[in-house]
Each structure stands twice: as structure tokens, then as C-alpha cells.
């Protein structure tokens, strides 16, 4: 119960250890200190500034804790030795040390950098290794590694458990001192590597390993178990984690990459050979992919497939391959680290995987399965050096009579033809010529475009901003939105459309994405002039399949249900989206076949895929052959989008090829051969003319003094003729090709084996294939032959699939990273806590930490400990954003630092927060987590109610003491956006403007009439500027110009802030209510007895979440649609051009100025003038003119209630909940009822989480006439707009206010 208070004390101790001479003691909500660094003074000295005080004196005083500025203590960050003070010796660090290589042993193009020793002197390979280390050993994340170490050391003291990670880190610091230095303001700055270039990765591994161990410690304590179980065998989770950690040490990412599939395979196949199996049974809709699933309880069933599993060659081979993989990883690790360690626990489990029982009712089994899926996060993101390889043209399978290449190609063609026809019947057409330019805006994302554009930005502040427009700064951007706005009119020109990207002058550039565990993914940044023709022809497929559902029965001709792309199965909750996997994994007749293709994209050759795809598209385009796009036919557009030198046989620039050669051989080259061409070599690499010379030099190198060379003439560009993962049609084309292979598999199996196996369902998502089948033979030989046939078809289709990764099993399903086993969910928690894909630039501290609450809630829903999550969140709440201020000084008030001042130069103000800030409402400058359960949001009304609840007293007492004592939080997004602007014209606007806007702009008479309408930024005359400005604010380089200006605004905010000034407001903004509104009414609580406990698939949950699921149950019906603002938003989403620019609030604000009484046709015209498409404008106006909207113009601010992944899977905010738990006056409007819904949802979740009997909540007005009169007045005022509006609107539009006034009399 008192965890929050204990956790806060623990975090305070961690903060006091991290910041020397600070005193964070819980007596106030924030702590201000100074930090001193001499770097600034050194820089200014070089420019001529003279200081009286000596830097060394200031540093000595700081280090001794005697330095103060304006009565504030100067603190310093703790050293590694201060944090890791325990003296330990570990054999694991010995393994790491023995694996460290000299720089001479470098393999320049190895995928993952090995552990190389730091070399202090000059070395020809040093710069290259350091450059790779800086990229590949990056951590990023949101907290410095020292902060993690500090809080983990305190958890270790509290729990008296010492994880291996912390011991290895202590040993490293004891032996070698500082591993690296990380800047606390910008976490991406890692310098001064100590002893080994991979030390940042080692420490990230130590931290993640420790978190995994502590998670096990807390989870086992919550479940009151001493160990995990594999069948009846006792498994020590700490030993299981440690054996994995130590095997990975010699070359972490490579070894983990090898071990990744055996661990997943083990979980999927655990217990599938047992003769009796316990399952969570469920019933569902007719189709196997139905999401309407009801869970009925656990029972034991016979395993019809057990004999096949135990005797079949496939299962023997599969196990053997996974054993071999594991042993290979161990041998590699032993050789590199010169050690004799193995993985006894995992190998023992692997050997007995089929016959050891998995019991879904035993939490010790479920946690072990989950741990095996999560353990791989230890080595962080798989940042790799991806060699720029060309397609292997020789190895590509050509059509012949003994393979299925042509057949698959033909099926792919037919699938495309059928898909277009189906999409057309579903109301989707290709982009028409008149909409061509408008549709280009679909591509206006924040991703790289393959082009770049220069924009003049005017900065209206700072020393050089002299009046008027301000200081002009030129920025270069590659993001698609800005490129389209400034150069969109050039995309579709003959020059750009005819350009072939297959020479060293014209080529395209690859990008990359880092993903946890797996190796870096290549992303092809395809040029916009290629994407636009692709968009025109493939739009109907993307649109249709993103929303079409349907049957997954193989006999069904429609493909809508079988091809699952887009948001069709992404409601935001795994447990709801994957309901079909839980149901099918509990069906004793079902045999799942989930095929895992290796490198699917690189096997999509012209022969088995591209020719068929293009023939299919051409065939489907025949009906549109009369259309002309700027004079071009659709056949020409297909050529521009997919033709030779556009996508087929294109050259791509990626990483330079790097070769290790002898220095003297390089010196002997002629000057001509050493000249640098167009392509710059990486840091620390010498230029050589071409790749041929590099290869010759490499052959001659024989261990003499070595250097690195790279070709610089473009001879190392990669020629690619396969599918590219950045095409507009990537996902849908992959799925249609996959369906073609799946069809051949089904046909061949049917032809040879008749009814021995029946296919019940087929689903395709990109390269994922999932079949639900029923085996009607018990012959082991027949089964093996069926499996052989499947793999043979795949091979003959020109693809590869591995037996060791393909799942063919009863009682087990895996679909898009969701694992289901015997009817329950085995969560795979691969959410990274310590590291992140890229640098986090946190602009809005409160917004970021609110999103962290959601992230941690999702993590808890996947088996993470609630208590540990709260401690981590409190640490993050205290520290994130503590060094945002750069030039602020506190001297009585807040002001800018005096420049070149002896007293102030080198000092920066830092603001630390008390850990309890995590649990205050956002409105009171807190982060809105609730101590009872992370998925409950601490709104103001919830805070007040929690104080009144007896069961919450222990949490709330310390919170009440410091109520509303937190100053405003840093939020750059609230900076005045007008401080930057641009005069770069949006040349593209005239092309993309819709007919109504074009008419207004070209007809002066109409234009004059429109000017009188209150459309503000969205009038036809301003809209291009508004869109340009909005796109500009998405460009990081432009946004960073706002930061210095915001600091001044923030100083004023701090200056004006006073503690304990907050009021409890029933309405948040004008005409907007929140759950606070409920505090106006009387709320009665009637306990409901006799409610049965529910069954649900996600059983690996901490007590706080488990109780909510047991009492409230899994969601069984769709969530009730919230306020009409949501409805307007969903209509606006139908307009691909203006969505994101025009929101429901924009529409409501305009309607408030105009009134709602206009006819639908008037409103349609109005919306068309705002550049909305005619269909969306019509839907919107029809919706707005309906009666119910006129009587309910209130907005509801949900504040994120029930918006996280876990709450989405609970039976809250549904009609069932309303019927069971709510009684409210019939006079309430729709918005008021929505507020009741959210209010009660929070309370029933809190009741469940704290172990109370569920209750019904009766909302009512008071029986006391005087109180009732006050409630009426308050309610009436809420429904009234401000007086300036009232004059316009009171007659008819505000019937809602009149109606409300006459209720509850």
C-alpha cells in the first residue's frame, strides 16, 4: 500500500547520490541549484574576454561543495566511482576483457562492431573505429546511464538483491575507471571512451540486465512464488538471464541475433507434444479471424497431434536446427572470449521442449515463457554497418518447367487484377487527372523525400532581428511536406519523369531504421517523382485493403479479409486485435502453419513478382486508357513509377565499401588513382579511384602496416532489381504476391494429399503467412510429406523459408509479434526503456512524461512489474528536462545571464523535481499518474475523490502536503509560433487548390465576398501560408530556432507563478467540460454483489492490473463513440489533403462565429472554400445540421482517460459498462453522459485495483432545493458561450442552454 512513499524515498536517495551536494528531501516540490563548467569561460577567453577569478579555484570549490551563486548551492554530477562504489570481482568481466581486440584485428565491414581496445596514440584505424563506435554504441534514451545506475543501486539496497549487471559495472569501474562520459543535457554526446570502444554498450547491457533481474524479483514477490517452473522442474530466472548475458558479452549484437530465433521457437513449441493439454477455452464468430471472442474458462483436452509431434521428421529437424544454432552461438562466444561457459538451463529446456507440460493456469510457467521472449532486449538496438550490396542476379531463379516461378508470377498478376476490381466495387478508384496535384499531398509526411529544398526563415527575435520581418536564416530540408510545398510543381515535369537513376551521376540514396534486437533495416528513400506515378495507380489498393474486412476462408473469392494491411486490426490494444490467435490456439483440432520467409524482399525478382505485378496493373488500367495526366497515358505513368532506371535496375548509394590494405601499397599508387571522386569516403578512410584498385590492394595486404581505403567514383553503388521497401505499394504488393505463393501451396497440397489436410483460414500481412488448418490423417509419414511439399513449393517459387523458424504446431499461434499459447497471451515485452532509436529532443516535458505513463502502462500489460514501473517513472519525473535552461540566472527573480561577467559566466541553473510530482494532475503541473494503478489518470476530480477514499489515504497524505507547489514545466511547443515565419512561396498551392478555392482566388467579386467570412487562417487567401507554416514547424532545424526565444518566455512564466493559486474548475475552457464537471452533482455508490470473476487471456499481470481484469473483464463490445468532436474529426480524416491542418476545433470555432442555423448546402460551400474536398464538406455539413448537434455544442476534454493499451482491453466505456455501473439523469446531454462515462470508468477501475467490491454509481442532482438551484445555475453557465458570442447566438442556436435552464427545477 505505502509503496509510493517508500518508492519516493528510494528515488530521492538516488537523486542525492547522483547530484553531489544537492539536498532532495521531500520538503518541497522542486529544487533549484547551479551547475558550473569552465568550458564557456575557456571559449570566451579565446575571443578576448578577461576574468579575475581562476577556473581552477572555482572547480576546486565546486568539487569540495563550497561553491554558491546568489545563495544557491552549486552541485556536480557524481563520478562513476561515487555511484559504483562496491569492490567486486566478476568472472563475466574477465570474459569481456579477454574478448577485446587490438585495432589491427579490425574487419572494416563486419556487420556489428566487436570489442576494440581504446588506443591513446595515433593509429591509422583509430578514427574509423571511433566513428563506427559513436554510431553503433549509441544509447540515446531519456535518462543518462549514470541516473539509471544510481536508481538501480538504490533498488538493490532496498531489495537486498544484487543483479549481475550492477556487479559487472562496479567491477569495470574498479578496474579501469570511467567507461565513458555522457553529456546530461544532450545524451547523444558520448566521449572519452575508457579502455574499450564498446563500453557504452556494455553499460547499457548491465543496466538492462539489472532491470530484467529486478523485474523478476518484484514479479515473483507479487505472485508469491520462489522460482519459475518448466513443467515440474524448478528454474531460477536470475541464472537464466545471467547465462544469456555472459554468452553475449564477447560480441553482444551478433550473438543475440543468432540466439533470437531459438528463444522464440522454444516458447512457441513448449509442450505441443504432451498427450493432455490445459487450455483457456473461448467461443467466437464463424470466421477463424473473428474478433468477437468470449472466454469461458480453463479445461483439459486431449492433444490429437502429440504422436505426430514426437515421431515426425519435421519436429526432429526443427529441434536439431535450433540446438545447432544455440551451440554455434556458444562456441563462437567461447572462442572470442576464451571461456568455457555454456547455457545449461536453456539447453536443458530446449532438449525437453515438446514433452514438458505448459500449464496456462500456473503463473510460474507463463512468466518463464514471457521472460524468454523479453530477455533479448539486453543488447539494445541492433545498430549495424549494412554493406551496400547489389542484387545477386546469378542466384535469382528463372522460370523453367521444373519450378513454379512463372506460375507464381501469373498468380501475382491475377491477384492484382482481382484486387483492382474488388477495390473498384468497394468504391475506390485511381487518382483522376484533376485530383493529381491534390493527391500528392498524401505523400507530405515528415520523412525524407530523396530531394532537398532551401527555405528562408525569418527569426523575429534576437540581437540581429531589427524590426519588421526579422533576421533571415536559410535552412535546408529534406522532409517531404516542405519539398512538396516548395517544389511540388516540378515533380511532374518531363525532365524529372524521364530521369533514369542508374548512373553514378543520377542515383538514389538508402536510409536506415534501427530496431531492437534485429539488425538495422534498410529503407529506400525513393524519389518523389517516382512515388507520385506509383500513388496514382496504386491508391485504390492501399485505400481499399486498409479498411476492407471479410472472410478468410480459402474458398472465398474476395481478398478483403485475407489481406490485412492498414489500421484494420489496430484498435490500439494487442489483446483485442489478436483475439483470433487466442481462440485458435485453444482449439484442439487446429494446426497452425505460420511461414517465416527469410529476406522476402530480396527474393521478389522480376521473374516471380515484378513482371506479374506490372502486367496486372496494366491490365487493370485498361478501363482508364482514355485518361491523360499532363498529356501522359497510364501506361507511361506505370513506366515512370516502376520502369527501368526508375525502380527496376536502379543504382543506390549506401555505406561506402571499405577495404583494409597495406600502407606502402597505397603510397605506391599514382596520384591519379588516389584522387578523391564525387563520393566522400567515411572518416578515417583514404580515397581510391575505383573498387577494382581496392580489391587488388586487398589481395596483396598481408598483415603489414594497414590502412583503410574506399572507392570514390561510385563504382561501389549497389544495382538493385528486386522489390524496394519504400515503394508506395510495398505492403499491398508483398501481400498479393504472398497470397499467390499461398495459393500454390494449397493447390499442390490438395493435388497430392487430397483431404488429408483442410485449410480453414488464410491470412497475409506483407511477408507473414498464417494458415489455420485441420489435419485429417494421423500418419506421421503423410504429415512429413505435407510439410516437405510446403517447403518445396516455397523453394520452387524462388523464395527461402527456414524450418527452424517456421511454426507448424497445435495449441500455438504467432501473428505479427503476438504470441498465443493454449488460449492465453504470452506477452513479448520488447519495449526499450534505457535506449531509443534516435536522439530524443524533448520539447514538452509534461507531454513527454504523460506519454511515458502510457508506455509504462503498456509495459505492465506485457508482464512488467507495476511497482518497478512506478519507481522508474518517479525517477524520470524528477530528472527529465532538468537541464533545459541555458542562460537563465536566479537572482531574486529569473533573468538572462550577464555576458562576459566574472561572477556569472560558466553557471547554469538546473531544476530538479520531487519524485511525487509524478502523481499530481497535469493541470497542477504534475504528470497525472495514479499511485493505485498506472492506467488510472490523476485528474483534479480524481485527486479530490482519492483524498476522500479511505483505501487511498496512505498514498494521498504525502501528496496533500505539497499540493500545487510545482512551478510551470518547460514546453517549447507553447512558444509563440509567429516568432518564425517564411516568405518562401508555396508555389505548389495553385496546383493543389481545389476548384472552390481556385474560383475565389481568380474571381475578384467572389473573393471580396469571401473576405468578409470569419475563416481566419483557413480563408483561401491565407490557407497556403497556414499550411506552409505548419509544415515549417515540423522541420527540426526551424523549430530549434524557437528554443532560445522560448527560454525568455519561460522566465516570465516562472516569474509570474505563485504556489497554491490553482482553482478547481468545473469547466476547462469555454464550452468544454472534463470529468471535473461531475463534482457539481451528487454521486451515490451502491455495491454490486454476486458479480462473477471473469476469464481473460492476458494473465501475466501485476496485481493492480490483474484485479481490474478479473472484476471488469475483457472488452466484449465496441467502445461507445465519444463526443461529437470525435465524429467531426473522423469525418475530416477522410480528406487526405487537409487532415492534420483542419481539426474539429477549427470547425467548431468557425461555427461559433457564424452560428449553426445555416442550411447544409451553405455550410458545404463554406467548407469547400476552406479547401476541403466536396464529399467531406458535404458529409460534414449534413452531420452538423442534424438536430442532435444543434442541441449539444459542448466539447469534452478526455485528458487521456481510458486511452492506454491496457484500459482499451477492459470492459469500460462500453454500453455494457453503462448498463451495469451507471445511473444518470435522462436530461443529461450526450457530452454530459460522455463525461459521466469517463468519470465512472476511472472509479470502477480504482475500486477493482484496490480490491473493493464493484459498485454502481448513481449521478443525481441534490434533493436540497437550495443546492439544486446552484447546480442548475452552474450547469446553465457551462452551456453558455462568452457574452460576445451570446449576442449572435442566443436566439436559436443555443436551445441547448435554454433546455438546460428549465431542467431539474
Swiss-Prot record:
Keywords: Nucleotide-binding, Nucleotidyltransferase, RNA-directed RNA polymerase, Transferase, Viral RNA replication
PROSITE patterns: RDRP_DSRNA_REO
Organism of provenance: African horse sickness virus (AHSV)
Protein name: RNA-directed RNA polymerase
Catalytic activity: RNA(n) + a ribonucleoside 5'-triphosphate = RNA(n+1) + diphosphate
Pfam family, one: Orbi_VP1
Family to which this protein belongs: Belongs to the reoviridae RNA-directed RNA polymerase family.
Annotated ranges, domain RdRp catalytic: 563-814
EC number: 2.7.7.48
GO biological process, any: DNA-templated transcription
GO molecular function: nucleotide binding; RNA binding; RNA-directed RNA polymerase activity
Top-level taxon in the UniProt lineage: Viruses
Signal peptide, first to last residue: none
First-tier enzyme category under EC: transferase
